[in-house]
From Swiss-Prot:
Gene3D superfamilies: 1.10.8.60, ClpX chaperone, C4-type zinc finger domain, P-loop containing nucleotide triphosphate hydrolases. It comes from Xanthomonas oryzae pv. oryzae (strain KACC10331 / KXO85). Pfam families: AAA_2 (PF07724), ClpB_D2-small (PF10431), zf-C4_ClpX (PF06689). Component of the ClpX-ClpP complex. Forms a hexameric ring that, in the presence of ATP, binds to fourteen ClpP subunits assembled into a disk-like structure with a central cavity, resembling the structure of eukaryotic proteasomes. This is ATP-dependent Clp protease ATP-binding subunit ClpX. NCBIfam families: clpX (TIGR00382), PRK05342.1 (NF003745). One of its GO terms (cellular component) is HslUV protease complex. One of its GO terms (molecular function) is ATP hydrolysis activity. Belongs to the ClpX chaperone family.
């Protein structure tokens, strides 16, 4: 290349030098020409080394920024009350998942298998919040999919590939970011087959969806339409490799406790050697779910292949009244803290009495909505006050007690004391 440039310049005896290190064309193996500059092969190699070192430093920084399981648990504790066992299971599983991604980049001899997660717990026990908090902590793209809207390809409804498209939308169609994101699939128990006989129960929104999700969860290259794909059909589909995407599936699995109990009872046997079943030994649902085995999930209606793709199972307990009261007051995003902030922006103090918090928790337990129903209850009792308050003057405090939660009275408004009018001076 340098000889061609010499020929064009008309000066065949001119010696060319590297613009970076100053070596002549005779001192190096190759001299590459650019617009009025030259670079030798040695400088190219040096540039490659510099770039390689910077990439390794970035990778090392990413490794050091990955929080340890204990640090993950500490953050989860700030947002999710209770569920210690589930939080520990998640912390370890997520930490190992991202370590696995690092090991793949090193071309290690040992290949680590992917460990997706199944969350089993009652409605409102914190499954979705756990997944959201994890994604926020790790600063990775996160999306939630509803399993009940998914159908097999070719039928009316959402294809499973739509999940990956939602994940891409969350990171502005950055494929590299999406490939290390987290997907939470909710209501996974609703796609269970209704019988253990697959030949008569296969349907487009049940077992069929489980089959469609298998490859996606295990790791495959999904073809996803680009941004505005229908408007620009000539664009090529984006190829997203799902092998490093962490899938967390969650569901209430109503009735699973009975399946577990049935297995335990069958294991007890019959006859004189059988264990005596007593009503006093009746366990709480949360403790029963903690004993779940893969065979129980299969009997419930998940196909064996799907259960095998979710090796990490974390069970959540049903929240009791003390736990719900803590949820109302302790987390960073506690509901009472949020409403106090809203009232504070109006210059008004909001107070929840202890009996009010207890009444809110009892009402949520009665509705069987768990923590999810707490906000609805608080919204309903404060709606009229929040409507009237901006138009009222001199209100300094709003007090909510049990009678307000039971709709027996309105929130108590406390007004600022008006300054006494100044007396006019009496004339002599």
């Amino acid at each position: 290349m340098s000889e061609d440039r010499q020929g064009r310049s008309g000066d065949s005896n001119k010696i060319l030098y590297c613009s970076f290190c100053g070596k002549s064309q005779h001192e190096v193996r190759k001299l590459i020409a650019g617009p009025s500059v030259f670079i030798c092969d040695e400088c190219v190699e040096l540039c490659n080394d510099i770039i390689r070192e910077e990439l390794e430093e970035k990778a090392q920084s990413a490794r050091s920024s990955l929080p340890k399981p204990r640090e993950i648990l500490e953050v989860l504790d700030q947002y999710v009350i209770g569920q210690l066992r589930a939080k520990r299971t998640l912390a370890v599983a997520v930490y190992n998942h991202y370590k696995r991604i690092e090991s793949r980049s090193k071309n290690d001899d040992v290949e680590l298998a992917k460990s997706n997660i199944l969350l089993v717990g009652p409605t409102g026990s914190g499954k979705t919040l756990l997944a959201e908090t994890l994604a926020r902590l790790l600063n990775v793209p996160f999306t939630i999919a509803d399993a009940t809207t998914l159908t097999e390809a070719g039928y009316v409804g959402e294809d499973v590939e739509n999940i990956i498209q939602k994940l891409l939308q969350k990171c502005d169609y950055d494929v590299e970011k999406a490939q290390q994101g987290i997907v939470y699939i909710d209501e996974i128990d609703k796609i269970s087959r209704k019988s253990e006989n697959p030949s008569i129960t296969r349907d487009v929104s049940g077992e069929g969806v489980q089959q469609a999700l298998l490859k996606l969860i295990e790791g495959t290259v999904a073809s996803v339409p680009p941004q505005g794909g229908r408007k620009h059909p000539q664009q090529e589909f984006l190829q997203v490799d799902t092998k490093n995407i962490l899938f967390i599936c969650g569901g209430a699995f109503a009735g699973l406790d009975k399946v577990i109990q049935q297995r335990s009872n069958d294991a007890g046997g019959i006859g004189f050697g059988a264990k005596v079943k007593s009503s006093e030994r009746k366990q709480e649902v949360g403790k029963i779910l903690a004993e779940v085995e893969p065979e129980d999930l299969i009997k419930f209606g998940l196909i064996p292949e799907f259960v095998g793709r979710l090796p990490v199972v974390a069970t959540l307990e049903e929240l009791d009244e003390p736990a719900l009261i803590k949820i109302l007051t302790e987390p960073k995003n506690a509901i009472t803290k949020q409403f106090k902030k809203l009232f504070d922006m109006e210059g008004v103090e909001l107070e929840f009495r202890a009996d009010a918090l207890s009444a809110i928790a009892k009402k949520a337990l009665k509705r069987k909505t768990g923590a999810r129903g707490l906000r609805t209850i608080v919204e309903s009792v404060l709606l009229d006050t929040m409507y009237e308050l901006p138009s009222q003057e001199n209100v300094s405090k709003v007090v909510v007690d049990e009678s307000v939660i039971e709709h027996k009275s309105e929130p108590y408004l406390i007004y600022q004391a008006q300054p006494a009018p100044a007396k006019a001076a009496s004339g002599d």
